[in-house]
């Protein structure tokens, strides 16, 4: 049999087969075929013993007796093993119960007790309170946990002790440090006005950064811009285009002031609102915006540089909703030139956002002349932020506006395209915060 263990099947076939010789000495004998199951051998053997009927019966009986004896021994061995396993499990349970009782008896049962250190998750305190005056007796001393009134917080799952180099700055001091930057500001509320074709969506980075400094920020969406349902071709005046901004100022309290910030054509809307609500505007900030003088229109301003700005001429698409015999009703942008014209320094994700969000600019407000006075418009402190890599409103055009209508102070954003809220949001935020802190100059 080799290394295989053989078991005899309970079913046996005894097929009498006649000798091929037919008669003679082999006529009274038969050959028996037995089916044997071999485990764990993977092959089946077929034995063909030539046995008589009487010999086969005695051999089969003896083998059956041997199998029964082996089966009985296996069952007895398994029964003893099961009893030993139950005995071991019972001993383990008794030992566990004894250890639990011992631990319970050694732990003090009062309200001030603490969990033994061996069962306590290790922690370290960044700002630890005063050390306990005493420790418990015994080989293991109880560790007092920090109280809620202590100036600190628990650092989870760390047993590192505090080092002398660890700063003692509390979490709330980080916020206070940021808020200290705007303590000297006259107002803590910004109002943001988007440029032509843009919407309130373009200020999402600036809003986030200013709010982190503790400012309240409002982004106004002008008529026919962003999510406005009004058709741009139907806007016929600067007052109509600026209506949401005017409504905002009307809703302010009489003594409330804001810092007004405008971009691009939003500068013309700012000038219109500054003339109407001078007492509600603490400061006005023009970001590459149309800072118009009295009697000037945005179209007049851009016509000064239109001949030298080939990219602007290529990017602009005039719309004639009333027919080409009449003036244009709106100006759209060639989407394929947006990157080169407006967003040459902006991230691709912001370019993608602008590509699906920009709308046409109403032409009537662009061609309308603005009338401002020194008493109202001139009483508001103005600041200008130049964008130094701007191809839509080139630096020369920005400087021409500054020279014609000088502000109190001029700032520069290096590396910024026409959309600094995309290309240089951190730098823009820094300048806005700085402007909010500039105090009034004392008259000599």
Curated annotation (Swiss-Prot):
Keywords: Chloroplast, Hydrolase, Plastid, Transit peptide. Residues 65-82 have a biased composition (Basic residues). Gene3D superfamilies: alpha/beta hydrolase. Pfam families: Abhydrolase_6. It is an enzyme of class 3 (hydrolase). Its EC number is 3.1.1.-. One of its GO terms (cellular component) is chloroplast. Its main location: plastid. Disulfide bonds: none annotated. Residues 190-310 form the AB hydrolase-1 domain. GO terms for molecular function: hydrolase activity. SUPFAM superfamilies: alpha/beta-Hydrolases. It comes from the Eukaryota. The keyword Transit peptide applies. InterPro entries: AB_hydrolase_1, AB_hydrolase_fold, MES/HNL. It is found in: Plastid, Chloroplast. Residues 1-60 form a transit peptide. Residues 1-32, 49-90, 124-176 are annotated as: Disordered. Residues 124-148 have a biased composition (Polar residues). The active site is at residues 264, 390, 418. Residues 49-64, 149-164 have a biased composition (Low complexity). Putative methylesterase. Belongs to the AB hydrolase superfamily. Methylesterase family. This is Putative methylesterase 13, chloroplastic. It comes from Arabidopsis thaliana.
